[in-house]
UniProtKB/Swiss-Prot annotation:
Binding-site residues, CTP: 26, 159-161, 198-203, 234
Enzyme Commission designation: 6.3.4.2
One GO BP: pyrimidine nucleobase biosynthetic process
Annotated positions binding L-glutamine: 364, 392-395, 415, 472
Highest taxon in the source lineage: Archaea
InterPro entries, per database record: Class_I_gatase-like, CTP_synthase, CTP_synthase_N, GATASE, GATase1_CTP_Synthase, P-loop_NTPase
Major enzyme class: ligase
Organism name: Haloarcula marismortui (strain ATCC 43049 / DSM 3752 / JCM 8966 / VKM B-1809)
CDD domains, per database record: CTPS_N, GATase1_CTP_Synthase
Alphabetical UniProt keywords: ATP-binding, Glutamine amidotransferase, Ligase, Magnesium, Metal-binding, Nucleotide-binding, Pyrimidine biosynthesis
Domain Glutamine amidotransferase type-1: 307-544
Name of protein: CTP synthase
Length: 553
């Protein structure tokens, strides 16, 4: 399926597959390496998509703990997936679907359901061929309509959970033409105490990979600095790859510089030559350069943003961090995010919040830390600090307004306090009978109608927007009239559902909340309107009247 309405897909090229595995340890940056390769191929004129393989038994990431796993990223079709798919969407500027995330739980569930329905005609159902065949089918279907599909295998080579996937890739390589398959292995190259780059971990990792029947075509060394030529030659010799197939991916402060760095190494050109598509690439002077222009521009200032939440793992709010960074790219400023723990709103954290230029309260679940979020929202509202509330942040803004403006002292969300006498946030009607947790929220892209002559209309440049949702609760319709009579404007709606709230310019320079998650559609080259407006308010522009770049959401 094409990933975009307009595609550069050339069926005469056939489909090309790049498999990316990792060794030595997890968290090396396989996803960023893969996404950067895809970005460069897209710059060269190819239509590129990606698949992330997660070897866990969960069907999706929807019920995973953000403290341990990081954020749950939501796709346009409602798929709740690993945060790496967010990186692929941002780097490749595509909209992916749940089919682009392959999990062990999803695969096993499908095979078992087929067995129960008699599709296997009484045969013994086994890992090989039934599970491996299903894995290969999923990869091919996700790649349909694209020139290149990049498949990242989560985890580390040697993990028992990943064995069926590596076997499926071994079979896949035999079933496709040699020119259509490329194996990239990302591995750690640490320094010894005497400053020598050590290749032994890479050698052992490749040995493990080869024992499974896979020979890498490209090796990418993750190191604090670039690999020196002696290190590359040694890795090439002992791992049986040409020296020119060994590339560096050193540490950087900003992941958006990685495509530029691996381009300097010549990774993209080598990939195109190995896949026999170099002759089809755009000439270098005709390739997309906006990415390079954005990430290398000299910024003209700094903005301090307080992010008030309860998850102290930065990855739990990855898309919010990235959306703020994208807005900074558009406004040509550096955005420094100050973490404020909403569970510990002591003097230290309160001071960090008060010293910030703007306040963002992101989404989340559970009662812990909500009073700290409400306190932060009140501070922003009463002191004219630019404010953006997302999902739960939107709901807590309603609670704060009900308590401190409507004088409903005990107002709260029914999700967080079942016995509240004023449930200004209540469960969605269709959620009453639902008991299962996984995949049952209001999920995915939904259209919001925007009132004319509002802050939201100015930000989005039109009368509607389509953004991604992930929630079970909404503003209680019984309180809407009272809230609006007291000055809180609901400027965006989906039928009877309140989707956007704001205060007018006479009450606040920038106070807006969204029930949806605009951060999931933000891109480095196409920043999210509410985040751009937040920075405009800090920088002295009036987002209520400023002409922001119209974004097709």
């Amino acid at each position: 399926m094409p990933t975009e309405p307009e595609t550069d897909y050339d069926p005469e090229l056939g489909r090309k597959f790049i498999f990316v595995t990792g060794g030595v340890m997890s968290g090396l940056g396989k996803g960023i390496t893969a996404a950067s390769t895809g970005r460069l191929l897209k710059n060269a004129g190819f239509d590129v998509t990606a698949v992330k393989i997660d070897p866990y038994l969960n069907v999706d990431a929807g019920t995973m703990n953000p403290f341990q796993h990081g954020e749950v990223y939501v796709l346009k079709d409602g798929g709740e997936v690993d945060l790496d798919l967010g990186n692929y969407e941002r780097f490749l500027d595509i909209d992916m679907t749940f089919d682009h995330n392959v999990t062990t739980g999803k695969t096993y569930q499908h095979v078992i359901e087929k067995e129960r329905s008699g599709d296997y005609l009484g045969r013994t159902v086994q890992i090989i061929p039934h599970i491996t065949d299903d894995i290969k089918r999923r990869i091919r279907e996700a790649a349909e309509g694209n020139d290149v599909c990049i498949i990242e295998v989560g985890g580390t080579v040697g993990d028992i959970e990943g064995m069926p996937y590596l076997e499926a890739l071994r079979q896949f390589a035999h079933e496709e033409d040699e020119d259509d398959i490329l194996f990239t292995h990302v591995t750690l190259v640490p320094y010894s105490k005497n400053g020598e780059q050590k290749t032994k971990p890479t050698q052992h990792s490749v040995k493990e990979l080869r024992s499974i029947g896979l020979q890498p075509d490209i090796l990418v060394g993750r190191c604090s600095d670039k690999l020196d030529i002696d290190t590359k030659e040694k890795i090439g010799l002992f791992c049986d790859v040409p020296t020119e197939a060994v590339f560096s991916n050193p540490d950087v402060d900003d992941i958006y510089h990685v495509p530029l760095m691996v381009e300097e190494e010549g990774l993209d050109q080598y990939v195109m030559e190995e896949l026999d598509i170099a002759s089809e690439a755009l000439p270098e002077d005709e390739r997309e350069n906006r990415w390079r222009d954005l990430v290398t521009q000299n910024t003209e200032g700094e903005v301090e943003v307080a992010l008030v939440g309860k998850y102290d793992l930065e990855d739990a709010y990855m898309s919010v961090h990235e959306a703020l960074k994208h807005a900074g790219l558009e406004k040509n400023v550096d955005v420094n995010v100050r973490w404020v723990n909403s569970e510990k709103m002591n003097d230290h954290h309160a001071d960090r919040m008060r010293e910030a230029d703007a306040i963002v309260v992101p989404g989340g679940f559970g009662a812990r830390g909500t009073e700290g979020k409400i306190e932060a929202i009140r501070y922003a509202r009463e002191n004219d600090i630019p404010f953006l509330g997302l999902c739960l942040g939107f709901q807590m803004a309603v609670v704060e307004y009900a308590r401190n403006v409507l004088d409903l002292d005990d107002a709260h969300s029914a999700e967080l306090e079942e016995d509240t006498p004023h449930p200004v946030i209540d469960i969605l009607p269709e959620q009453y009978e639902i008991e299962d947790m996984g995949g049952t929220m209001r999920l995915g892209a939904h259209e919001t109608e925007i009132n004319a002559n509002t802050l939201a209309a100015t930000l989005y440049g039109g009368e509607s927007c389509t953004e991604r949702h992930r929630h079970r609760y909404e503003v209680n319709p019984e309180y809407i009239d009272d809230l609006e009579a007291a000055g809180l404007k609901f400027s965006g709606r989906a039928g009877n559902r309140m989707e956007i709230l704001e205060l007018g310019p006479e009450d606040h320079p920038y106070f807006i909340g969204t029930q949806f998650h605009p951060e999931f559609r933000s891109r480095p080259t196409r920043a999210s309107p509410p985040f751009v407006g937040l920075l405009e308010a800090v920088l002295g522009d009036d987002p209520h009247t400023a002409t922001t770049e119209e974004v097709s959401h």
